[in-house]
């Protein structure tokens, strides 16, 4: 925060201007309503999934514990950007202070990084369940699950603690207009009037590392799962194994694909319009899709939901 204060004193200004989504829309009011509905669906969908996992004894397993953690991250993730964006649209304000911008940046970096590692942990959990079913209760006991989940949150926060202070310490004298709907690192860095090429290279390496470790774990886990499934004699066993993995792979492809575009492709591929559309996808749409993917394609979750609705209807 001291760096942010010095920056503000140096430039004589304190507020950034978020150009946002609504300025480019022909129907900003309609877009606001759509985003608000998506936001409510994301919160309610993930909250219901967490409630089902907590209340139904059949869902008290490591796989569903990690799904509940993913739902918690998604609820926090969409809440970092959407409420402020909608409130600013209603109030007719598009400014964000430097400390507020830094906090938003830290939170979304932490949550995105945590989700990267959580998706890798979920792949490892599927590997142990399918390849070592007899040892699964020991290898993935409750203490191990808590340790792995805590590790995901910690490693995600490392990304936030590394990139946020450096990004916010640059002098911003070129422009204060952020061509984005929230304080994303590339959109803020481009405003600096100092040479950021070294920082951008280091940020690229950091993001490669943040993606490479989870992708390696996911790829290795699913390679071993495929080999194990190939050896199965039971067609029903193969079907069940693929069913439990397909939902997770869908989420991995959606989330990692957007992250690769944002942080690993050269700047020549980027435009403010493309960047915002990709960010809308992984910050707003992904949190609403995840609970649908994990519930509609999962018999246990759908069974728990039907049971809960039946009990409520009877009462």
Curated annotation (Swiss-Prot):
GO MF terms held by the record: G protein-coupled receptor activity; olfactory receptor activity
Organism superkingdom: Eukaryota
SUPFAM superfamilies: Family A G protein-coupled receptor-like
Record carries keyword Transmembrane helix: yes
Residues in compartment: Extracellular: 1-29, 84-104, 163-199, 264-276
Segments traversing the membrane: 30-53, 62-83, 105-124, 144-162, 200-223, 241-263, 277-296
Localization terms from the record: Cell membrane
Family annotation (InterPro entries): GPCR_Rhodpsn, GPCR_Rhodpsn_7TM, Olfact_rcpt
Cytoplasmic topological domain residue ranges: 54-61, 125-143, 224-240, 297-315
Topology relative to the membrane: Multi-pass membrane protein
GO cellular component: plasma membrane
Function (record text): Odorant receptor.
Family: Belongs to the G-protein coupled receptor 1 family.
Protein name as annotated: Olfactory receptor 2T5
């Amino acid at each position: 925060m001291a760096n942010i204060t010095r920056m503000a004193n140096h430039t004589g200004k304190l507020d950034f201007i978020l150009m946002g989504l609504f300025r480019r829309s022909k129907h900003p009011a309609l877009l606001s309503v759509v985003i608000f509905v998506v936001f409510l669906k994301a919160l309610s969908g993930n909250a219901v999934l967490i409630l089902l996992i907590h209340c139904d004894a059949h869902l008290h397993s490591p796989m569903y514990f990690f799904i509940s953690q993913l739902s918690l991250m998604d609820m926090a993730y969409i809440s970092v950007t959407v409420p402020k964006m909608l409130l600013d649209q209603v109030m007719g304000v598009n400014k964000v202070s430097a400390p507020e911008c830094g906090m938003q940046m830290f939170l979304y970096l932490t949550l995105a990084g945590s989700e990267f590692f959580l998706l890798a942990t979920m792949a490892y959990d599927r590997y142990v369940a399918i390849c070592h079913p007899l040892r699964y209760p020991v290898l993935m006991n409750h203490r191990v699950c808590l340790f792995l989940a805590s590790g995901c949150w910690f490693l995600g926060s490392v990304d936030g603690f590394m990139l946020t202070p450096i990004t916010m310490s640059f002098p911003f004298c070129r422009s204060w207009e952020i061509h984005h709907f929230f304080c994303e690192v590339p959109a803020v860095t481009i405003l600096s009037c100092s040479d950021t090429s070294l920082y951008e290279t280091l940020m690229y390496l950091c993001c490669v590392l943040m993606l490479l470790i989870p992708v390696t774990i996911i790829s290795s886990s699913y390679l071993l799962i495929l080999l194990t499934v190939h050896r199965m004699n039971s067609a029903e066993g193969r079907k069940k194994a693929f069913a439990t993995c397909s939902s997770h792979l869908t989420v991995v492809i959606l989330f990692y694909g957007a992250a690769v575009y944002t942080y690993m492709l050269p700047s020549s591929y980027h435009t403010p319009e493309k960047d915002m559309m990709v960010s809308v996808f992984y910050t707003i749409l992904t949190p609403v899709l995840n609970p649908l993917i994990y519930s509609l394609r999962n018999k246990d979750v759908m069974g728990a939901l039907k049971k809960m609705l039946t009990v409520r209807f009877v009462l």
